[in-house]
Amino acid sequence: MAAAVTAAVSFPSTKSTPLSTRTSSVITHEKINFNKVPLYYRNVSVGGKVGTIRAVASDVEAPVAKVEKHSKKMEEGVIVNKYKPKNPYTGRCLLNTKITGDDAPGETWHMVFSHEGEIPYREGQSVGVIPEGIDKNGKPHKLRLYSIASRPLGDFGDSKTVSLCVKRLIYTNDNGEIVKGVCSNFLCDLKPGSEVVLTGPVGKEMLMPKDPNATIIMLATGTGIAPFRSFLWKMFFEKHDDYKFNGLAWLFLGVPTSSSLLYKEEFEKMKEKAPENFRLDFAVSREQTNEKGEKMYIQTRMAQYDRELWELLKKDNTYVYMCGLKGMEKGIDDIMVSLAAEDGIDWFDYKKQLKKAEQWNVEVY
C-alpha cells in the first residue's frame, strides 16, 4: 500500500546560495509517535543551509496513474461480442457458391449472409456460427469461429452483409468411418434464403495497422486467405477520406493445386491496378517445385526472398499476419532462425519483440 505524505518545510533564510555550493545534501531523521500517528522530523542541509521537514505518513492509498496502451492497429471504435451465444443474431444466406475447381482436393465455398447492419465488423475480425441441430448428447451444437472474408461494406457494398470462406471438412477416422465436420458441412450446404445463427464480431489480433505507409506481409494457406481478402479490398478497391494505402502489401498464398487458388482473379486485378504497392506470390505444392526439386510450400516460396524479407522485418513499420494451417509456422521459423543467426540475433527472442510491438500476428488452426 502506498502511503500519502504531507510535509511542512521551513528554512531559516531565503537568501540565495551560489550554484557552486549546492553540491550535496544530508538528511537525518527521528521518528516520534504522537496520538498514534507517526511523525517524522528531518533536518535537511542543502548547500550549508539547514532546514526542518515535518512529515506525517498516513494509510491513505496514493492514486496510481493508469498507463494507457496505444495500439498501432485500427482499434478505435472496434466492437466485439455484440451478439453472444445466449443472444445471437439470425441472418439469412443470400449467396453460396463453390470457388474451387472439380479437381481440387476438397471443396471451398464463398457465402454471403445478411445482417442488416447489425454486425458492425472490421477487417481481420471473425464471426461465430451456431449450426442447426443437436449433438450426440442432445445439446445444441457449439459455435465455430470463422474469419470474415469481406470488407465492412460487404460484398454488396451496403454494409448489410458478411461473407465467409469455408472448406467442407470430410475425413476418414481411425476406424475407417467417414466423418463430416458439423459446421462446415452445414454452411456449405446452405441454400439462399436459409437462416443462419451468428455471434460476434470478435477479435482484435488481426486488425490492420493504422499506418497507411506500412509494409504488410500476409501469409496464408487455404481458407486462411479470408482476412487478407478483406485487407486488400480496403487497400486497393475502396476509397476512404481518412485512409489511402501508400505502403507495400505482400501476399504469400499456399495451396495444393491451381484449382485451389482462392480469389485469384481479384488479387491479380489488384496487382495490375497497383503494381508498385502489391506483390503476389503463390505456392502450389502439388504442381510446383523449387530449384532443388522440393515441393513448393509457402515457406519454400518465402525462402526465395529470405534476405529481402529479413531486411523488411527489421523495420519498425513492417507487420506480419499469418492465417491458416498451424503447420506452416515451423517452416517459416526455420527460415528465420538461420537468417537472424547470421546477424547474431536469436529469432525466437526477436519474434517475441515483434509480437509485443504488434508486428507479428498469428491466427492458425
Curated annotation (Swiss-Prot):
Coiled coil regions in record: none
PROSITE patterns assigned to the protein according to its UniProt record, in alphabetical order: FAD_FR
Membrane protein topology class: Peripheral membrane protein
Top-level taxon in the UniProt lineage: Eukaryota
Keyword field: Chloroplast, Electron transport, FAD, Flavoprotein, Membrane, NADP, Oxidoreductase, Photosynthesis, Plastid, Thylakoid, Transit peptide, Transport
Named cofactor requirement(s): FAD
Pathway assigned in UniProt: Energy metabolism; photosynthesis
GO molecular function: ferredoxin-NADP+ reductase activity
Extent of Polar residues compositional bias: 11-22
Subcellular location: Plastid, Chloroplast stroma; Plastid, Chloroplast thylakoid membrane
One of the record's GO cellular component terms: chloroplast stroma
Main location: plastid
Gene Ontology BP term (one): photosynthesis
EC numbers for this chain: 1.18.1.2
Residues annotated for NADP(+) binding in this entry: S147, K167, T223, V255, P256, S285, R286, K295, G324, L325, E363
Enzyme class, first EC level, given as a word: oxidoreductase
Catalytic activity: 2 reduced [2Fe-2S]-[ferredoxin] + NADP(+) + H(+) = 2 oxidized [2Fe-2S]-[ferredoxin] + NADPH
Binding-site residues, FAD: R144, L145, Y146, S147, C165, V166, K167, Y171, V182, C183, S184, T223
Domain FAD-binding FR-type residue range list: 86-208
UniProt region (Disordered), positions on chain: 1-22
Function: May play a key role in regulating the relative amounts of cyclic and non-cyclic electron flow to meet the demands of the plant for ATP and reducing power.
Family: Belongs to the ferredoxin--NADP reductase type 1 family.
Protein's name according to its UniProt entry: Ferredoxin--NADP reductase, chloroplastic
